Amino acid sequence: GSGLHINLSLCMDGRNLFEGDIAPDSIAGSFMAGVLAHSRELTVFTNPLPNSYQRFGCDEAPRYVSWSRQNRSQLVRIPQVKGNNCRMELRSPDPACNPYLAVGLVLAAGLDGIEHRMVLQAPINKNLFDPTEAAGLGLERLPSTLEEAVQAAQESEFLHRVLPEELSHRYYEEELKRCAALKAAADSAEYERVHYFNAI
């Protein structure tokens, strides 16, 4: 499937905070740490269709919660470290997401990282599309199904804080209905083509 990568820059006093080396306890480092820490529970919002999860781990879509500078197998990468275009790139979202919810929650996750002074983990400079390179690293994985993503969100203390209860309850309910409808379909591929192809 297609990706809808979210690119974000942080600026303070006219300076791009993603420029140059990113210290683990810097503002930019804490922002990225927050995004990574909350990435599993955000997945139901960035990847809202059952088919979204077929993409993870192939076609340059991430599977693990990790970051690096130029490595496209990571969840977060830093594509540029010099000039005005310095930024972080979140590579998991897809075009089916509601951009207002997805971007808003990614920003909230990053700000939570800053507020709680989260420390950025070390970068992973391996090709995580290769199972032999990923093995033994002990990396947390993104949800592998929409049902798993809903469960991660429902159990999230962070999302309980930042989302209205009525909104989140209705959203999770609709996502689980999607899962049930697909399972009940006689031909799941045809069901997805009819219901989702034009949307994505």
PLM segments and residue spans:
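Catalytic-core signal marking the mid-to-C-terminal active-site face
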Residues: 11-200
